[in-house]
Regions:
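Hydrophobic strand positions within the blades of repeat-based beta-sheet folds
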Residues: 30, 70, 91-94, 110, ...
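Short glycine/acidic-enriched loop and turn motifs that connect beta-strands
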Residues: 17-22, 74-82, 150-155, 220-223
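Blade-edge motifs of beta-propeller repeat domains
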Residues: 24-50, 95-126, 166-196, 229-274
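Solenoidal tandem-repeat scaffolds enriched in leucines and small polar residues
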Residues: 1-60, 66, 71, 78, ...
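Extracellular/lumenal glycan-associated surfaces
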Residues: 15-17, 71-73, 122-130, 134, ...
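Acidic/hydrophobic-patterned starts of short beta strands in beta-sheet-rich repeat architectures
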Residues: 6-15, 62-71, 138-148, 208-217
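A detector of repeated loop/turn-to-beta-strand junctions in beta-rich toroidal repeat architectures
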Residues: 23-26, 85-90, 104, 156-161, ...
């Protein structure tokens, strides 16, 4: 939820997941009850040019209006359908304004073939599998942290990565973006096959210094899973001094009642209602 038209009330968007006639995921704007006194009779507006399986709202161009950012990670190689994301996955941006977000609005699409975005679009990268919005550099404009858990690091398949896209007055783009993985200098540990770094991501100002810290889930790390945490700074998340918080430290492992659940599996950024 977020205020995309600055009327003082938050709008809700529903991301309905893959459908038979729309694998990329239909998006609906929920304007609230259309029948007074009946909270179930909501007026849903279809946004036919928008897609997404997960999303977040934040002001990524600094104009005071909330913007909707969605992710579609599954490309045709994974979906088995040509009606899927750009090779390797993509995110979309719908900018808010005085009229909010409207049905005739065409989103801005960003992927790993976009100018300035680190890496290259490859089958199964899952760019956009998770995403989070927050001001990572303290400039007053929201940035977007994008999970890329299927990214290969060298020959290490599914080692995973995360990409920070910087918000700016001109809108979100690849300019100044930064990629992180477990081979990046300053990040503890080492990239390993099937770690799935970036399966979950979150930006939050944990230190109350107006710069969001970055949290990245690595749920397949060893038997328990980890979350990597880096403090925010004017340059964005700082890898020097960053730490891993792993399940074993909290008495959590991938064994027991839920052997397929791991620490780092759950962070905000994967919900279908925004």
């Amino acid at each position: 939820m977020g205020d995309v038209d600055r009327d003082g009330r938050a709008e809700r968007f529903w991301l309905l997941g893959s459908a038979e006639d729309d694998y990329r995921g239909p998006v609906r704007l929920d304007n609230g009850p259309s029948v007074p006194g009946n909270p179930l009779a909501n007026a849903l507006v279809r946004l036919p040019l928008a897609d997404g399986h997960r999303g977040r709202i934040g002001d990524v161009n600094g104009d005071g209006y909330g913007d909707l950012v969605t992710g579609i990670a599954e490309d045709p190689s994974m979906a088995g359908s040509p009606d899927a994301a750009h090779l390797g996955g993509e995110i979309q941006v719908l900018y808010g304004g005085p009229d909010g977000i409207t049905a005739d609005q065409r989103p801005t699409v960003i992927h790993q073939d976009s100018p300035g975005v680190p890496g290259a679009a490859e089958r199964g990268d899952l760019f956009g599998a998770s995403l989070s919005l927050g001001d990572a550099d303290g400039d007053g404009i929201a940035d977007v942290l994008v999970g890329v858990p299927g990214e290969a690091i060298g020959k290490l398949e599914w080692a995973g990565a995360a990409v920070l896209l910087r918000g700016a007055e001109g809108g979100l783009s690849g300019a100044g973006s930064v990629a992180y993985n477990r081979s990046t200098a300053g990040i503890p540990g080492a990239a390993e096959k099937d770690d799935a770094f970036g399966s979950t991501v979150h930006l939050a100002d944990l230190t109350k210094d107006a710069r969001a810290e970055a949290l990245v889930g690595v749920p397949a790390e060893n038997s328990d899973g980890c979350v990597w945490a880096a403090r925010g700074a004017a340059s964005g998340p700082v890898t020097a001094g960053s730490v891993n918080h792993c399940g074993k430290s909290f008495g959590i492992t991938g064994r027991g009642d839920h052997p397929k659940a791991h620490f780092g599996d759950a962070l905000p950024g994967v919900h279908r209602a925004v």
